[in-house]
């Protein structure tokens, strides 16, 4: 994924139309009234000149540099909805040293979090999810056992802006995860997840022939691909294809927990089988999603509504507290297994030298 040499250099743009001073006064506040409001002298207004190729280079140079930088990431998050971005926010605050790539199939990130239920504006979060809002500095109405954000888009835009300000996090939107990179551990002979296979989301596999994808290696994948839409619960469905062994889904997975200095391993991929999401029950669903957020198979943490497809738990919409706090718990789960998975990957193919 190394960019072409031409794009690694930094060409100096010498294009110049001998413009007049570009320091034009634009004031976004005016105390004038009755037809005298003026934010700028629009008759004299003019943008600084630019050559079209300058715009192309400004975009492509940075995008190719990001592809090169994040081809080897510490963490890959699949899905930029409320759970995925909440996890990214928590990870970014706690570990600014880690490279974190977020892969989102939609052109517009945010998942189903731009509106509340049935296209209504307000967002409801049951307590104690309000503590996550407090950390972001987001206003809400306190209704006792729950809080209300006046518009779901306010929550999502605030969260997204904070995540994208972290220098160690890159969002690749309009990019789809097509498959998972797997590794077989020579010590246990079991598979684990070690990255993702990506492609442009707009490609049509039915009508185009050459569709080879690209890859991102990482130590832990966090999947938050939801349950609706063409890519809903993608990772969980792919795991079932990789595993195929029958299993009693009511038994639950082995939850990784640090009881001693050694981490308890989750179940192998060969034991994985979808539970299938059940009907709506808010009181059961939100607790189940947060408590169940974990490393489901080695190298893969699943959070948010995708987890309902894994465990066979209930859906809970339209309340969003579990999405935010599932993201927080997912960040915790990722950090608790990160070093172990890194050591395993280095033992398999050696440490990354880039």
From Swiss-Prot:
Keyword terms of this UniProt record: Cytoplasm, Iron, Metal-binding, NAD, Nucleus, Thiamine biosynthesis, Transferase
Primary site of residence: cytoplasm
Quaternary context: Homooctamer.
Protein name: Thiamine thiazole synthase
Organism: Candida albicans (strain WO-1)
Free-text function comment from the UniProt entry: Involved in biosynthesis of the thiamine precursor thiazole. Catalyzes the conversion of NAD and glycine to adenosine diphosphate 5-(2-hydroxyethyl)-4-methylthiazole-2-carboxylic acid (ADT), an adenylated thiazole intermediate. The reaction includes an iron-dependent sulfide transfer from a conserved cysteine residue of the protein to a thiazole intermediate. The enzyme can only undergo a single turnover, which suggests it is a suicide enzyme. May have additional roles in adaptation to various stress conditions and in DNA damage tolerance.
Co-factor binding comment: Binds 1 Fe cation per subunit.
UniProt GO cellular component terms: cytosol; nucleus
GO biological process: thiamine biosynthetic process; thiazole biosynthetic process
Modification after translation, per record: During the catalytic reaction, a sulfide is transferred from Cys-210 to a reaction intermediate, generating a dehydroalanine residue.
One GO MF term attached to the UniProt entry: cysteine-dependent adenosine diphosphate thiazole synthase activity
Domain of life where this protein originates: Eukaryota
